[in-house]
C-alpha cells in the first residue's frame, strides 16, 4: 500500500463490532475489517453459525472474537457494549447490521397484501430492524460519547428509499425508519465526534430471511431482480466491502448523516 492509501483507509487497531455477523452481509463486513487489521467482535443470535464464522476468520490469523446477542433485547445489547468497553477500553466502529427480511414462513413469491399483515409478524420484523438498530446505536453512542469519537453504520436497504417487489410491509417500514433515525442521530452526535451513516444495499446473495440465509434465490426472484438492476445481476456480499472500509476509515472523516446506496443502479430507475 502507498502512504496515501494507508493514511486514508487505515483501520488497523480499530475496535469494531458487527451485529448479524455470522453470515451474509454481516460476515463480509466483519471479514474486510479484520483483513485490514481491525479488532472485530462478531455478534449474532445464531450461536453455532457464529462460532463457525468466527473460527473461520481466526484460523487465518485475524483478530476476532464472538458475542451472542439478540439486538431486540436492550439489556443484552447494553451488556455487550459494557463488556467490550471493559475488555478493550472502548469501541471505535459499530456496524448495526442485524436484521430480518421477513418472518419464518414468508414466501416472497406470494407477496403480501396490506389487509393480511399479521401484527405478530410486524412486531417481530420491526423489533429487530428498527428497535434492535436503535438499541445498538444507543449503546454505541453511550460508549463513543465517553471517548469523544466513533463511527456508527446502519444496514438499511434501498427498500427504505423506494417500494421493492416481493418485500414485506414491515421490512419497507423499518428500513425507511432507520434511514431517518440515522439522519437524526448524525445531527445530534456530530458535536461529539461521532459519524453516523447508513448503507442501502440492493439485491445481494446471502439475504437474511426469517433469521436464516438463502444463498440461492429462486429462479423467479433472480430473474425479477436482474430485470430491475441496470448492471443486470444480483451482487455478492464481497461487493459491499468497499463501502464498509470507506465508512470505517479516515477516508470518510467528513461524511455523516448519509444513506449510501449500493444496488447496481436499480434506484435510479425508481
Predicted regions and their residues:
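Short C-terminal tail/terminal secondary-structure segment
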Residues: 2-10, 245, 256-270
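Substrate-binding pocket helix/loop in short-chain dehydrogenase/reductase
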Residues: 105-114, 118-123, 221, 225
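Active-site helix of classical SDR
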Residues: 137, 174, 182
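Alpha-helical segment proximal to the catalytic Tyr-Lys
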Residues: 142, 187-188, 253
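Residue(s) in the substrate-gating loop at a strand-loop-helix junction
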Residues: 157
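Short, small/polar-rich loop/turn modules that mediate ligand/substrate recognition or access, typified
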Residues: 190, 195, 200, 255-257
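Short, flexible catalytic-loop segment of classical short-chain dehydrogenase/reductase
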Residues: 196, 200-212
